[in-house]
Swiss-Prot record:
InterPro entries: Homeodomain-like_sf, Myb_dom, Myb_TF_plants, SANT/Myb. Modulates overall growth by reducing the proliferation activity of meristematic cells and delaying development. Flavonol-specific transcription activator involved in the regulation of several genes of flavonoid biosynthesis. Activates the expression of CHS, CHI, F3H and FLS1. Confers tolerance to UV-B. SUPFAM superfamilies: Homeodomain-like. It holds the Pfam family Myb_DNA-binding. It comes from Arabidopsis thaliana. Residues 9-61, 62-116 form the HTH myb-type domain. This is Transcription factor MYB11. PROSITE patterns: HTH_MYB. Keywords: Developmental protein, DNA-binding, Nucleus, Repeat, Transcription, Transcription regulation. It comes from the Eukaryota.
Length: 343
């Protein structure tokens, strides 16, 4: 709904008040009083709005208005009342005789609010800024990129290298047999497990990457020349064994004696094969497969006869080819043939 307008706003004069209008308004109020501000302009013969007449009288034409600047005592009163009443300017003005609410409001917005901003600054902040130590002097020169990068300090892992893995340095060699007539070895060994892979604490057992106690894996597996190299560092970082996983293999040698049997026996000790060896190598299966392959090999005479038969067949094929193409040409005939072809 709202309040009804004070006038029709038709034919109303706007802008600055003239001295004649000020005298007319003052004479009418002094003789008739303020009365109703809605009907006052019409009764006084002013072409002004009732609101404009009221503000002109209260703020400028009253006889009890105090002129001049606001004193420091009045400033203190305004500050105290503003802290309790807020922006209720008319109530503040009632405690300051001769001052209008509009004047107090303008003075607060233009002067006092700016002064109070400096008054209420925390002294601790000002003292901290004033008493701050000077910044340290920088050494001349450019800052390196490494110094500008953020540094992340990581707690190094306790990388323990057990020295308890001790195995006998030995080779497991499948036996080589000798023929009684001394014709030489029948065949090389099928498998040799070098002692370098089971050397001891310096060369721990093999295992898949990440199977170690700490799960670390050596990221670099290349040697100095860029080739793949299985050195001690890779073994140390890939898999480490302790005493509980140590593999002890006893050496085995075949008895190569002239008067011994053609197929000498062999013995592999399984004294201390622990759980780790059983997971990766089934020694019984290796032994059985090797013995089976050994029994299936033919003797030396059959091998030699097969080789001789192959050579005879090749000679027959070459002779047959020469018969099909005729006798080979001598050098003179070949030269003549080449000259005829090039002519």
């Amino acid at each position: 709904m709202g309040r009804a307008p004070c006038c029709e706003k038709v034919g109303i004069k706007k802008g600055r008040w003239t001295a004649e209008e000020d005298r007319t308004l003052s004479d009418y109020i002094q003789s008739n009083g303020e009365g109703s501000w809605r009907s006052l302009p019409k009764n006084a013969g002013l072409k002004r709005c009732g609101k404009s007449c009221r503000l002109r009288w209260i703020n400028y034409l009253r006889s009890d208005i105090k002129r001049g600047n606001i004193t420091p005592e009045e400033e203190d009163v305004i500050v105290k009342l503003h802290s309790t009443l807020g922006t209720r300017w008319s109530t503040i003005a009632s405690n300051l005789p001769g001052r209008t609410d509009n004047e107090i409001k303008n003075y607060w917005n233009s002067h006092l609010s700016r002064k109070l901003h400096g008054y209420f600054r925390k002294p601790t902040v000002a003292n901290t800024v004033e008493n701050a130590p000077p910044p340290p002097k920088r050494r001349p020169g450019r800052t390196s990129r490494s110094a500008m990068k953020p540094k992340f300090i990581l707690n190094p892992k306790n990388h323990k290298t057990p020295n308890s893995f001790k195995a006998n340095k030995s080779d497991i060699v499948l036996p080589t047999t000798t023929i009684e007539n001394g014709e030489g070895d029948k065949e090389d060994a099928l498998m040799v497990l070098s002692s370098s892979s089971l050397s001891g604490a310096e060369e721990p057992g093999l295992g898949p990457c990440g199977y170690g106690d700490d799960g670390d894996c050596n990221p670099s597996i290349n040697g100095d020349d860029g080739a793949l190299c299985l050195n001690d560092d890779i073994f140390d970082s890939c898999f480490l064994l302790d005493d509980s996983h140590a593999v002890h293999v006893s050496s085995c040698e075949s008895n190569n004696v002239k008067n011994s049997e053609p197929y000498g026996g062999m013995s592999v000790g399984h004294k201390n094969i622990e759980t780790m060896a059983d997971d990766f190598v089934d020694w019984d299966f290796v032994w059985r497969e090797g013995q089976t392959l050994w029994d299936e090999k033919e003797d030396l005479d059959s091998v030699l006869s097969r080789l001789l038969d192959g050579e005879e067949m090749e000679s027959e094929i070459r002779q047959r080819d020469s018969n099909d193409f005729g006798e080979p040409l001598d050098i003179d005939e070949e030269n003549k043939m080449a000259a005829w072809l090039l002519s």
